[in-house]
Each structure stands twice: as C-alpha cells, then as structure tokens.
Design a protein with these regions (language model features):
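Conserved core of the sugar-phosphate nucleotidyltransferase
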Residues: 120, 137-209, 213-296, 300-304
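Extended, hydrophobic alpha-helical segments in both membrane/secreted and soluble proteins
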Residues: 102-106, 213, 236-238, 457-458
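Hydrophobic/aromatic beta-strand patches that form the interior of the parallel beta-sheet core
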Residues: 75, 94, 124, 153-155, ...
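Residues immediately flanking
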Residues: 78-79, 214, 296, 364
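Surface-exposed, flexible loop/turn segments at secondary-structure boundaries
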Residues: 82, 131, 160, 217, ...
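N-terminal glycine-rich phosphate-binding loop and ensuing alpha1 helix
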Residues: 2-152, 161, 172-182, 186-189, ...
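Conserved short loop/turn motifs at secondary-structure junctions
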Residues: 122-131, 214-216, 355-359, 363
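Left-handed beta-helix
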Residues: 1-73, 227-458
Length: 458
C-alpha cells in the first residue's frame, strides 16, 4: 500500500515539474516515515549546551568585518503565508510604519549596510509559488536592490500532503492547491542546490550566507557577526538568545551523547512527558532565533558528498488537508527545520546575540508591538527600542487574531504603549486616535462591543 503511496507521490511531483533533487529528498523522508521514524529526541540522549561565544565579547576589526560582509549574501525565508493571522500572502507584505512593509524596511537595512561598508551584499528571497508574485512586485519598487546579475529570489520546493490512513497523496477537489505543502524551511539547502543558485553565488565569489525569517526585523545585516563567523572557521552557526520565562516554545541546541554533535530540538521533537525539561530556562538556557550563518562552499561539498541529502531529522507534522477546516481529511506533512542542519556539519558552533536581533511577528500581538511607539524606526530601517523593556501585549483572540479584524479595531493606529508594562484587551473594542496605555493597562470585556474614545488613558 505505502509503496504505491511513494510511487504515486513521485509521479505527482514529476508531473508538477518538481526538481528531481527534491523528489530524491522527499523519497528519503517518506522511507523514514514508513520505517516508523517519529523524529523524537528524548532528554536522556542529549546534554544541555550551556557554553557558547557571546557577541558582546567578540573583537573583530572594522576591516575584518567589512571583508567578511563583502563575501556574504542575505537570504530571507519568505515562502510561508501568514495563515495564523488570516493572511493569504506573505507576512512580509504587511505595513509596519508609514506605509512601509517588512520587505521595504528589509531593503532599507540592506542598502544602509551597503553604503556603510562599501559591499554588494545581495538580498535574495526564498519564495513559494504563493508568495512570489506579490513579493517581487514590492522589490520592483527598489530597482537598486539587485546586484551582480543575481536573481532576487528562488523557489522553495513543494511536495504532496499524505493521507494519514495510507500514506498516499491526498486528493482534494475543492481546492487542488491544498494537496501540496512546502517541505519545511529545511528545504532551503536542497532548493539552493537544485535551482543552480548555490553554484552561481560561489562563482561570483560569495562564501557565506546569513538567513532569517522575513518577518524578523531584528535580523539586520551584521558585519560584526560576519567577521566573527569568518574568523571562527566554522561551517555553520545559529544565533541564539538567552531564554526568559516567556520563551518556552523556541527550539534549543543540545549535544547528542552518541557522537558529540550539536543538534537542534524543537517542541515537535520532544516527548510530551519531557516538555518540562524542554521549557526549563536554566537547563537549556538559550533558544534558537532561526538567524543562521553557513559556509556556502562547505554546504556544496557536503550536499555533493551525500547525494543531495543532508539527512536532517524528520518532522512528522499531522494536519488536516484544509488547515481552515478541522473536520477535513487528516494528512501528514513531511518537514525538516533549517536550523537542524547544525548536526550535519562537523565543527558547527553558535553565538549568543542580544534580544534585539529577535523580533518575529507571529501574531497580531507582535504586530501591535512593532507598530507601536515602543520602537522607533531609524533611516536605516532598524527598529530601536525606546523603553528599557518591551510591553507584553495580549489581545482577545476572538476579535483581534485575524488581520482584518485587527485593522478594523485600530482604524486610527495602535495606542501608545511605551510607558506600559503590559496591555491586555478582553472583549470587542475599537480604539480611537491617540489612546495612551500606562502601567499594567487592562480593558475588560464588560460593556463591549464598544469604542475607546480618542485621547483616552488606560
């Protein structure tokens, strides 16, 4: 039955024009799934990673930093749709400040680094079929961003969702697009090789790549980290932040007892009865930002040596074929995480960076924060925090979770929260202009739906 499932999946991918390299990788993971791989990493098989370099202690000369940055390319993951916020396109296209989107601010950051260091610093997006057109349209408004004849993007691969009952490719006539999914952001390495972009970058003299999620405005180009990475001689290094009690979800690095390799463990790879170890900020003191640095030359050599398969751990993701309909057919998506490649490279390391390099926007709570006066956006597209610490935002998900609902309830902009420790909104409230929140601000559900008047203090 499952042999038929694999063959059917391979035919479906070939008919859709998926790269042969991507089909080979999919086959590897399909066979792992068949063999019963769960991707789980029990606590007893690892040692916590507690000692890593800190950017605060790094000493790199201006010239070393500039030289390393001149050989660096920036790759931003831009293939996911902001479905959790009700979006049907890339989150990076949401406006942040003065009509500028995440993508516009990213371009500002890249152009500022080019001016400061006199380097070419290409910016390349990893898009999906569903994010490509809109994103390239935004970049078309910045013709100066393209350099060295390199493309502005490359496409991540796609693979069939598998029926959970028999592992055959799912069929969904209501929307055949929903029969497909991306193979997780671990696909970046396969897609770089299969697209020819990896060879093109090496041919033009680029040696290092820095990657991050396109919604993380904190992950600006850093000549200092580039200089550290080049000097370290390591093939691969993620940026890590020190955990706080709020950081219970982010993946962490650990040392595998069997071979001493550094590995990444995410929540989906942790046995349920061991989640208390995973969330212990003292046992596993750093979390993974998904800002990564890797050596393009070593990546190519490793991929060629392994027949294009890095062998990242499988993430078995159980979903429904229509993510918006929990009663639709159960499916399994075969995924890998970009950060899991840390275990594929001997000599991989990591670096602790300040919290300012991790500003992801996963929810409308995060979006309110980056749009608020907690941050100022400078001419270089960098977000600078105004108060000593960020305000904690909690908006009632019944009324603010989806972007359309969120925008409708802040027609005159978000409130001032720079003098607030927290902002909690219960119920359905529409905010007027110039609302100011201070201290531990709270709006109760009683009296809603309603409007909070212009100039109110809460």
């Amino acid at each position: 039955m499952s042999e038929n499932g694999l063959t059917s999946s391979q035919h479906k991918m070939r008919d859709a024009g998926v790269a042969e390299q991507a089909i080979t990788v999919f086959t590897h993971y399909y066979q792992s799934l068949e063999a019963g791989a769960t991707g789980l990493i029990p606590e007893e098989t690892i040692e916590p990673l507690t000692q890593i370099d800190s950017l605060a202690d790094v000493e790199v000369s201006e010239e070393q930093a500039r030289e390393a940055l001149s050989k660096t390319v920036l790759i931003r993951l831009n293939g996911g749709l902001g479905t959790s916020m009700g979006l049907d396109r890339a989150k990076s296209l949401l406006p942040v400040r003065d009509g500028k989107t995440f993508l516009d601010l990213l371009v500002d950051q890249v152009l500022a680094a080019r001016r400061r260091y006199g380097v070419s610093l290409p910016l390349i997006l990893m898009n999906s079929f569903r994010t490509r057109e809109d994103s390239l349209e935004v970049l078309a408004g910045h013709p100066e961003i393209q350099v060295d004849g390199l493309p502005l993007d490359f496409l991540q691969n796609r693979e069939p969702k598998l029926r959970a009952d028999d592992l055959t490719p799912v069929e969904w006539e209501a929307d055949p697009e929903l029969e497909w999914c991306p193979p997780g952001h671990g696909d970046i390495y396969t897609a770089l090789l299969a697209s020819g972009l990896l060879d093109a970058l090496l041919d033009k003299g680029y040696r290092y790549a820095m990657t991050a999620n396109s919604d993380n405005l904190g992950a600006a180009p850093s000549a200092r980290i580039a200089g550290w990475f080049a000097a370290s001689g390591a093939p691969y290094a993620p940026e890590m932040c020190r955990r706080t009690p709020a950081d219970v979800k982010g993946g962490h690095l650990a040392v595998r007892k069997s071979d001493g390799r550094i590995i990444l463990r995410d929540t989906a790879q942790t046995p349920e009865d061991q989640m208390h170890y995973f969330t212990d900020q003292f046992r596993h003191p750093f979390f993974h930002t998904n800002n990564l640095w890797f050596d393009l030359k070593v990546l190519r050599e490793t991929l060629v040596e392994r027949g294009g398969i890095l062998g990242l751990p499988l993430i078995r993701n159980s979903k429904t074929v229509d993510p918006a309909d929990s009663s639709s057919m159960p499916v399994i998506q075969l995924e890998t995480a970009m950060g899991a490649a840390v275990e594929a490279f001997e000599g991989a390391t990591a670096i602790e960076v300040p919290r300012s390099r991790f500003l992801p926007v996963k929810t409308t709570n995060d979006l309110l924060l980056v749009r608020s006066d907690v941050y100022e956006v400078d001419d270089d597209g960098l977000l600078q925090m105004v108060p000593d610490r960020a305000c904690t935002v909690s908006l009632d998900p019944r009324f603010y979770k989806k972007i359309q609902d969120f925008e409708a309830r802040f027609p005159d902009g978000v409130p001032s929260i720079k003098d607030a420790q927290s902002l909690t909104v219960e119920g359905d409230w529409t905010f007027g202009a110039d609302v100011v929140a201070t201290g531990e601000a709270r709006v109760e559900a009683e009296g809603s739906p309603g409007r909070i008047a212009d100039g109110s203090r809460i």
